[in-house]
Design a protein with these regions (language model features):
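Short coil/turn segments that connect the beta-strands within blades of beta-propeller domains
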Residues: 19-22, 92-94, 130-134, 225-229, ...
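Conserved beta-strand positions in repeat-built beta-propeller and related beta-rich domains
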Residues: 25-41, 46-49, 55-57, 96-100, ...
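Short loop/turn segments that connect beta-strands within beta-propeller blades
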Residues: 67-71, 106-110, 149-153, 244-248, ...
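Structural signal for beta-propeller blades
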Residues: 63, 103-105, 143-146, 238-241, ...
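Short, conserved, GDST-rich strand-edge loop motifs in beta-rich repeat architectures
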Residues: 25-58, 146, 169-171, 182-219
Length: 317
């Protein structure tokens, strides 16, 4: 593996090369203190996995808009408050955003709600930009991906990690493998083999905390090069995968990331992802990588100590 490291603290600060930027963002929770306390509490789990170990009360967050000009925030406004919004995407007259286990679609001055019993902890939404007829949804709570038509709001595609080679998480208390399934016959097989398992038979009533998930797919986007593929980010494994929609097979595109978010394909055989707890943005593939490190930049609050958390990356054209 060839790695080229870049410390952003050594870069020159220049805010003159880009125009005014308008952003639409999600704020998962306004209670940042509670998030920090959960992180510290769960830091020493035996499974060594980042994330909550039990279902918690849903927090209130919001959708906000920001304007950045010459390196300064010149406008900020919370547009609405709702339960834990994470995913948001907007293109031309279409806007879609998520709230925990549902998707809201705004199109031509109308709003439609899309639900699915397997929607849980939705993290991202990606509108297909060329024809504007489809969107992808990452249902992180059940390690799954969905595609819906924008016009009819019909499900067009689904993919579950458990049924495509990623069939177990870890018990956060013991560190043992915990096999996951929504299939009754598979659950019976695990029972007969004496394996520890969790059978999700009623997704509306059952939940799967972050630390127990097999993949924790926290983003999925369309492949701009190959329409047969989608690009998904696996938080626990630290990998960006390229998933073939026809076969269900997942091929590793970018690895070695720490609790990543926001995987994407930049061009043929070149990908990008945010190595969140590594404090880096990484581009490249499985053979060669370029890393942009945020660790030494000024402005981090003292209580974070040596913790890094770079949540996501967007390409501004």
């Amino acid at each position: 593996m060839v790695v080229n490291n870049n410390d952003l603290a050594t870069f020159k600060i220049d805010n003159s090369f880009y125009p005014e930027i308008k952003l639409l963002i999600t704020i998962k929770s306004f209670d940042l203190q509670a998030i920090r306390e959960r992180y510290l509490k769960n830091k020493n789990k035996k499974s060594n996995r980042t994330g909550s170990v039990a279902r918690r009360e849903i927090a209130t967050g919001g959708i906000a808009e920001l304007t950045i000009k010459n390196g300064e925030i010149t406008h900020s406004e919370v547009l609405t408050e709702l339960p834990e919004p994470r995913g948001v995407d907007s293109f031309d007259e279409i806007t879609a955003f998520s709230s925990e286990n549902r998707v809201y679609l705004l199109n031509n001055n109308s709003i439609t709600t899309i639900t699915n019993p397997w929607f849980s902890y939705i993290h991202t939404i990606d509108i297909e930009k060329s024809q504007k007829k489809r969107m992808l949804v990452s249902s992180s709570g059940f390690d799954s991906i969905f595609e819906y038509s924008l016009e009819e709001q019909k499900k067009m595609f689904e993919w579950f990690a458990w049924e495509n080679g990623f069939d177990h998480g870890l018990d956060p208390e013991s560190g043992e493998k915990l096999f996951l399934t929504r299939n009754e016959e598979k659950a019976a097989q695990y029972e007969a083999e004496g394996k520890k398992y969790l059978f999700i038979s009623d997704p509306a009533a059952q939940t799967l905390p972050t630390a127990k998930r097999a993949a924790f797919i926290n983003s999925v986007v369309y492949d701009p090069v190959d329409k047969n593929n989608v690009i998904a980010t696996f938080f626990h494994e630290g990998t960006v995968y390229e998933i073939d929609r026809n076969t269900g097979q997942a091929g590793k595109a970018l690895g070695g990331l720490k609790n990543p978010h926001g995987g994407m394909k930049l061009e043929f055989n070149r990908y990008a992802g945010t190595s969140t707890t590594g404090g880096e943005i990484i581009t490249g593939n499985t053979y060669s990588q370029t890393c942009y490190n945020f660790e030494n930049l000024k402005g981090k609050q003292d209580f974070l100590i040596d913790m890094q958390w770079v949540q996501n990356t967007k390409i501004i054209e």
